[in-house]
Amino acid sequence: MAATHTLPLASPGMARICLYGDLQRFGRRIDLRVKTGAEAIRALATQLPAFRQKLSDGWYQVRIAGRDVSTSGLTAQLHETLPDGAVIHIVPRVAGAKSGGVFQIVLGAAAIAGSFFTAGATLAAWGAAIGAGGMTGILFSLGASMVLGGVAQMLAPKARTPRIQTTDNGKQNTYFSSLDNMVAQGNVLPVLYGEMRVGSRVVSQEISTADEGDGGQVVVIGR
């Protein structure tokens, strides 16, 4: 009995990516043969580094096959199998609109991270791996937490380090003269010998006032 040695090589259907606003510099309509929205974004981000950078800098409304992508279901929706002829819309939106409510908007950097999250694996494959054993599920959960935690860390603002010229309230340190003569806590204090021709660095200070009409009582108003 003859055996046929063939592989199922069914190619994915065509999908159209429609870009709007500033993203149109990379093309208005781009047709790609992809299986998921994640593959489409990943393909554009890989071939167009400037597109990846631009998408990472703002908020966008992403609509895949007639459904808006939400922040909570971002990764799942990006990895859903697309119907043939699906259209993906990526529309720039202002950041303040995320609390509006007519449509969902997502952070572009999160969309990029979600597209590269499973490295091309489908959600069905991940589900099978998780169902294979409890330890596999635990490892997957830990890995997902590390990846998403890293994304959150990249998006979080960096703490400002203290500067010699400014105090914690952001104002210039000129308490005693027009020269900078105060230093924020934790900064280096120079040790000078001989005659100084530079501004001083006051370690501590106290400002007080005397009320001459009340027996010369000294009232401390700043320290």
From Swiss-Prot:
Q: Per the record, what is one GO cellular component?
A: host cell cytoplasm
Compartments in which it is found: Host cytoplasm
Q: Give the record's keywords alphabetically.
A: Host cytoplasm, Late protein, Viral release from host cell, Viral tail assembly
Q: Which InterPro entries match?
A: Beta-grasp_dom_sf, Phage_lambda_tail_I
| Gene Ontology BP, a term | viral tail assembly
| Highest rank taxon of the organism | Viruses
From the record, give the cysteines joined by S-S bonds: none
**Where would you say this protein principally sits, based on its record?**
host cell
What is the purpose of this protein?
Plays a role in distal tail tip complex assembly. The tail tip complex is assembled successively with three tail tip proteins J, one tail tip protein I, one tail tip protein L and one tail tip protein K. The tail tip complex interacts with tail measure protein to initiate tail tube assembly. The formation of the tail tip complex is completed by the addition of tail tip protein M, which is followed by tail tube polymerization. May be excluded form tail tip during maturation and would be absent from virions.
**Family per UniProt?**
Belongs to the lambda-like tail tip protein I family.
Protein name stated in the entry: Tail tip assembly protein I
Taxonomic lineage from the root: Viruses, Duplodnaviria, Heunggongvirae, Uroviricota, Caudoviricetes
Q: Which gene encodes it?
A: I
